[in-house]
Amino acid sequence: MEGSLFFTNATPSTSILKITDYKYLRLEKNDSTFVAELVLCRPKQYNSMDDDFYNEFISIYDEIQNDSKIRCVILRGEGKGLTAGLNLGKIAPLITGDSEVSQSQNNLDLFKMIRRWQASLDKINKCSKPTIALIHGACIGGGVDMITACDIRLCSSDAKFSIRETKLSIIADLGTLQRISKIVGSGFARELALTGKDIDAKTAERFNLVNHVYPDHDTLLSEGRKLALSIAQNSPLVVQATKLTLNHADDHTIDEGLYRVALQNAAFLKSDDLNESATSFFEKRQPIFKCNL
């Protein structure tokens, strides 16, 4: 029953969201490098987010997960920045609800919508393929929700970050508050979340929100693509299992993590990819990996 989400932490089902005509997102695949670029492609709207955006995001990450020719994902935005966050003009009617139904029904509909949006961005974290966020210009509100779900974050020197929801009298509800303390530390996370202030690229780097800052957008793209390629050239079986192991470590003890990785290596250590790594090393050629989780 849909109402059961009130009483459980279960992620809402998104299996019915299959979209073929994307308007907010573009997936650029390169079968020779095994790197895909997921592009927020509405620059005139500052790549802002609304209900249709989140539905597309669910569908496109299902496509990424199920495509064995994608080993690493780059997430980036077209135009002047990554995203300005929520499109408040389009979201406002969804929040105020339908005057022809009861307030309790409007509240339930809003709850379901928020849970679906949460599941949308959580697709990044749950996808076994690593995602690298390349951030330039504005990364506001929902943009921070999105990048904190990514595995690696890089930015250019013009990047600006804000948990802007606070200034709009909204609690950030799509993942930032659950993830950012683990990235930047509790004290600075609280400073950002309680003030809603902007921070620049250098501050983001100093507090580990991003790994590296590059002088301009072109350098960011070039270096981000090099990093993605270096990941995609490794065994996809090992890369994907490593990501899942790191995710598991976020909320389990060291002993639980060690037991899990022992089981994984007992199952996968003698893989075809291991044999291919050894063979290609002695033959002095690039390995040709075929295994995926």
From Swiss-Prot:
UniProt keyword annotations, A-Z: Fatty acid metabolism, Isomerase, Lipid metabolism, Mitochondrion, Transit peptide
Protein name from the UniProt record: Delta(3,5)-Delta(2,4)-dienoyl-CoA isomerase, mitochondrial
Superkingdom of source: Eukaryota
Site note Important for catalytic activity, residues: 165, 173
One matching Pfam family: ECH_1
GO biological process: fatty acid beta-oxidation
Xref: Gene3D superfamilies: 2-enoyl-CoA Hydratase, Chain A, domain 1, Lyase 2-enoyl-coa Hydratase, Chain A, domain 2
Functional note: Isomerization of 3-trans,5-cis-dienoyl-CoA to 2-trans,4-trans-dienoyl-CoA.
Gene: ech1
Major location category of this protein: mitochondrion
GO CC terms of this entry: mitochondrion; peroxisome
Family in the record: Belongs to the enoyl-CoA hydratase/isomerase family.
Pathway involvement of the protein, from the record: Lipid metabolism; fatty acid beta-oxidation
Amino acids binding substrate: 84-88, 142
